[in-house]
Amino acid sequence: PIGAYALGIEYGLVNWSTMLNNSPLYQKQDMVIRDEDYCRKNGLMGLSDKQLRAYPNAWRSWPRNYGGNYGDHSDIPLWNGLARSLNTIAIRVGDLVGASNIFNFVYNTLQLNTLDPVNDVGLAQMVMGSQTHGVTPTALAAAFQIFYDGQYTTPHLYTRVLDRDGNIYLENNATSYQALTPDTAYVMNRLLKNVLYSSVGTAGGRYPNSNGMESFGKTGTASDEKDLWFVGGTPYYVTAVWWGYDAPYDMTKTLGKQQAKTRTCVMAWKALMEQVQADLPYKAFPSSAGVVER
C-alpha cells in the first residue's frame, strides 16, 4: 500500500469507494505473462515472446490472489480489496499509477534504497513484493510511518546521549519531511484500519487492546509461505515483523497455511504492542479537515 494505493489516492486516481474488477489485469489469451512452469516442462524457455505466441498454453492470467484463485470477476470497492489483500485489486491500482511512479516514490521519497533501479521497476516488484533484494523491517516500518500524518523521518537508533552531568555527548539529527499530504495519509490510515477491524480484513479482530487506541496494519505473505510479514501502526509506534528462516523454508509444513497467513506476525505484533503501550495515555490518530467522511 505504500506505493500503489497511497499514490493512487494522492494523484486523485482512486478513492475509498472506487469500484475495481476482482480479476487478473492480464488474461491468458492476452499473451502477456509467461507460464514459466509450462515453458520449463516443455522446453520453451529459450524462445522469444514472438516465437512463444505459437503456444497458447505457454501463457497465463496474472495476477492470482493468495491461495491461487483469480478472483470472481465482480466489481468491489477499493477498501474491500485492500482489507482482503487482493492482488487483483492492488495491481489494477498500481497499473493506474504506473510502476515507474511507484518506484520513484518508494526509492527516493521513502528511501527504500535496497531496491534495484534496473530490475525492480515493474508492477510485480512494486505492488506484489517480487523485488530483487527486498527491503528490511526497519526500512518498511519507516515507510509506513507516513500513514500517521504524511511525514517521513529517517530511521535512527537513538536521539541523544547525555553524560553523567546531563550534557549532550552525542545527538542524532534525524531528517523529517512531508511525503504525502495529510489528506492522503488520513485516508490510507482509515483504509489500513480495516485490515484489523473489518470482518473481511486479513487480520480481522487481531488489534492490540491498548486503552481503546486504534491501530492500522497490513499483512504480507509470499506465495510459497517462506516469508511472512506484518506492519502495524498505532498513534505511538510503527512496527514491522518478519517471520522466516535465514535459509528459506516453507512454513506451512509446521504452521499450516491459514496460520502462516494470519496468525504469526500479527499475533507477535499484538502481544508486543499490548506490553509496550500498557502504561501510555490514550492518543488518537490525527484527522484531516480536507477529508469528507460519511
Where do the language-model regions lie?
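A penicillin-recognizing enzyme superfamily signal
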Residues: 2, 14-15, 80-84, 133-294
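Intrinsically disordered or highly flexible coil/loop and linker segments, enriched in small
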Residues: 87-91, 99-103, 111, 115-116, ...
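Extended, hydrophobic alpha-helical segments in both membrane/secreted and soluble proteins
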Residues: 1-9, 89-90, 102, 106, ...
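Short acidic/histidine-centered micro-motifs embedded in hydrophobic/aromatic stretches
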Residues: 22-23, 105-109, 160-161
